A protein has these predicted regions:
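Alpha-helical, coiled-coil/dimerization segments enriched in small aliphatic residues
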Residues: 79-81, 198-227
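A short, structured surface patch at a secondary-structure boundary
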Residues: 53-107, 111-116, 214-217
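Structured C-terminal subdomain patch of bacterial secreted/periplasmic proteins
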Residues: 145-146, 153, 162, 176, ...
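Flexible loop/hinge segments that line or gate small-molecule binding clefts
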Residues: 83-86, 118-150, 154, 281
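Proline-aspartate-enriched helix->loop->beta-strand connector
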Residues: 93, 101-114, 131, 232-246
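Short helix-initiation/N-cap motifs at beta->coil->alpha
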Residues: 39-42, 90-102, 223-233
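Extracytoplasmic ligand-binding site segments that recognize negatively charged/polar headgroups
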Residues: 119-121, 137-150, 185-208, 252-254
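Bacterial Sec-exported substrate-binding components of ABC uptake systems
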Residues: 2-6, 12, 18-60, 159-189, ...
Length: 316
């Protein structure tokens, strides 16, 4: 009987020890899988632990990183967008389209935040160096909010990300709630030295116009295309929009002067209702060509002010 009791006792001890080891292994497994997510490129990314050395390859993400309480050890150089004060002294690794890989690798990052369309060519090299990469896209308003959510998950500050997204929604609603119910017919033209294209819902200006409830007369031509597509003068005359928005690199005053010359030299322009009424607006590149990020509500208000100046008079 004593032997049976002793054997039973030993069995209990062994079982407890095994259970203890099993729990420990489970904890390690959980600890080794800090975060799993799908990034903007549709890649499944798993972080074994919370990243400590994050590098951003685009200045567009800096304000969003700051908003969720994140820190970085390296960043792309910003020529136009504002850099948060706390990040100005952070080492730079080159312009967004000309990243210095030697400088980047020298920072020994454990996570790189890359642009979906700008930096996908770097992903294989970074991953071969055991560096995690999350590709982000923040052209549309929904993409900005998704990026904020991802960054909140990366830094473990989901509550801050949620609050920031709620604030963005409120700021946009504060503008759209003041607008008349009518649907303005608009077109968004992107002008370069070689061509003029029209922009759709996946461009910044196109997304903003959608948020404001405007009707893009070029929507049919853009169906199934990317954010821009060529558009003929004949089609523009036929659609005859109420308002024309123009995006272009350069100073708005210079662009407006160039447009006046074009209008003068091409009678077809002068047949357009928008041109006759003086409703051609050049949109600032810092809000409509360069990703506005958390300034998206500012872009929404800017476009709304051009269309309905009386609604937003006296700084409303």
């Amino acid at each position: 009987m004593k032997l049976q009791k002793l054997a039973c006792g030993l069995l209990c001890v062994v079982m407890l020890a095994v259970a203890g080891c099993g729990g420990s292994a489970g904890d390690k497994k959980a600890a080794g899988n800090y975060l799993s997510l799908e990034d903007a490129a549709g890649r499944q990314v798993t972080l074994a632990q919370k990243p400590e050395r994050v590098v951003s390859l685009s200045p567009s993400y800096l304000s969003m990183i700051e908003a969720v309480g994140g820190k970085i050890v390296g960043r792309a150089t910003s020529k136009v967008g504002a850099v948060p004060e706390a990040m100005k002294a952070v080492p730079e690794i080159g312009l967004v389209y000309n990243i210095n890989m030697e400088s980047l690798l020298g920072l020994k990052p454990d996570l790189v935040l890359a642009g979906k369309n700008q930096h996908e060519k770097f992903v294989p090299l970074l991953e071969s160096n055991k560096i995690n990469v999350i590709e982000l896209d923040a052209k549309t308003f929904d993409e900005v909010k998704k990026t904020v959510t991802i960054l909140g998950s990366v830094y473990g500050t989901q509550d801050k990300a949620k609050a920031e997204n709620e604030l963005l929604d409120k700021q946009v609603a504060d503008v759209t709630s003041k607008l008349p119910k009518e649907k303005k017919r608009i077109v968004i033209m992107h002008a370069t030295a070689s061509a003029v294209t029209v922009e759709g819902a996946h461009s910044i200006a196109g997304c903003v116009s959608d948020l404001l409830g405007f009707e893009n007369v070029a929507a049919a031509a853009l169906k199934g295309k990317s954010d821009k597509t060529p558009y003929s003068m004949e089609a523009l005359v036929e659609q005859n929009p109420d308002i024309i928005f123009v995006t272009s690199m350069g100073k708005p005053g210079e662009i407006e002067n160039r447009l006046r010359v074009d209008f003068k030299n091409n009678p077809a322009w002068n047949s357009l209702q928008a041109v006759k009424a003086g409703r051609v607006y050049v949109l600032p590149e810092n809000l409509f060509l360069i990703n506005p990020g958390l300034r998206y509500p500012e872009a929404v208000k800017y476009m709304a002010q051009q269309v309905y100046p009386e609604v937003f008079a006296n700084g409303k």
